[in-house]
């Protein structure tokens, strides 16, 4: 029996959408008030500059929360890890202490010899892979077998699974959506890198950059579209996941490639 509560997850995501859209609305309202004021006409222009990071933040906040909701949904499904896609397993595997320990060992072996030639590295590699390393590798393989045959670790903080790399730009957005199985083609990501770039410019003190009123309003509208578009895509994904889980004729809720499922009926 799955512990998936789609209604609660959609409700949680709807709240993050509402919070982000409220920020965008407030930014526009403040700008309208400043623009209507007869005194100090420089204020609207300065406000547009300092608002850019907030406009971007409205997008990032909703994005990270929405992706985390998807991971929470996958965590709540009572399926063994090997019934999930390789990308989902890779995300969860990176959180396992045994895997991190093994990666650290491999990095240790190579980092020590980083200045040496490839032939020297390989020679030293043979010497370094001693009994302890062999034992650790064996333990890791056993642990991976156990990992694959049991459910995804429910103790993992799903917020830590979201890959942001400091900026949620076009590549990062597509990467996270691909991992889960969301259609990033449903979003218009054509202006996202420009928004991130402008946000970073102001974040690094490039205050001479000007943001015109038309550009400002376009950014607000674009961020609004991104937030709503992602919400709709995740809502569809959650609803589809819920439907597949309830379909007793489907052996697994997911397929790496499009599934052609046919059913045979025996008549007695």
Model features per residue range: what roles?
Residues 59-66, 70, 74, 206, ...:
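A generic secondary-structure signal for well-formed alpha-helical elements
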Residues 55, 67-181:
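Helix-loop junctions and short alpha-helical segments
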Residues 52, 57-61, 230:
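Extended alpha-helical coiled-coil scaffold domains characteristic of the BAR superfamily
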Residues 64-67, 100, 107, 238, ...:
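Amphipathic alpha-helical interaction segments
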Residues 32-33, 104-124, 228-231, 246-257:
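Hydrophobic transmembrane alpha-helix bundles
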Residues 24, 55-56, 133, 206:
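Enrichment for repetitive, rod-forming helical segments
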Residues 2-29, 156-268:
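Polyanionic, low-complexity intrinsically disordered segments
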Residues 1-53, 65-91:
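Charged alpha-helical initiation segments
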